[in-house]
Design a protein with these regions (language model features):
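Conserved active-site-adjacent core of cysteine acyl-enzyme catalytic domains
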Residues: 2-28, 33-144
């Protein structure tokens, strides 16, 4: 079995958590008004103070999120990969922190935790499709 959830081009790809959310939202044209009104804020004045506020994807009204602890995954499934496949089959994206030193696409040798978006799998080739700053460079997708 093979399944890939829809993912578009994010309007901004600065931080992974925002890029993942924006890539999911990119497929819906109805989301554009909200994104332009509440996410993209462009304003400049001569002596304006810019107060940085992070984008909280958990508070995005256009996406329903659930936080499932790894302990719950371990209780309910024989293996974590089965949980990921089941979630994708049911049209859920998986946002997870991973040790990217274990993933060749990242080209990192030392243990390093980074958040990736898992949105597809291919059982025949035993691989998953992720989106992230692969190799901590440009935002994109890779089969792992």
């Amino acid at each position: 079995m093979k399944k890939i959830l829809e993912l578009g081009e994010p309007i901004s790809a600065t931080y992974s958590h925002a890029a993942h959310t924006l890539a999911i939202l990119a497929n819906e044209k109805n989301n554009r008004d909200w994104l332009m009104n509440c996410f993209i804020q462009i304003f400049g004045g001569e002596n304006d103070f810019l107060d940085y506020q992070d984008f909280g994807f958990m508070e995005c009204p256009l996406i329903h999120t659930q936080h499932i602890g790894i302990d719950m995954v371990d209780i309910g499934w024989k293996n974590r990969l089965d949980f990921v496949k089941m979630a994708i089959i049911n049209n859920y994206y998986i946002y997870a922190e991973m040790n990217v030193s274990k993933i060749n696409a990242y080209e990192i040798n030392k243990p390093f935790a980074h958040d990736a978006l898992v949105y597809g799998f291919d059982e025949e080739n035993k691989r998953f499709l992720i989106s992230d700053f692969i190799g901590l460079k440009k935002y994109g997708s890779a089969w792992i």
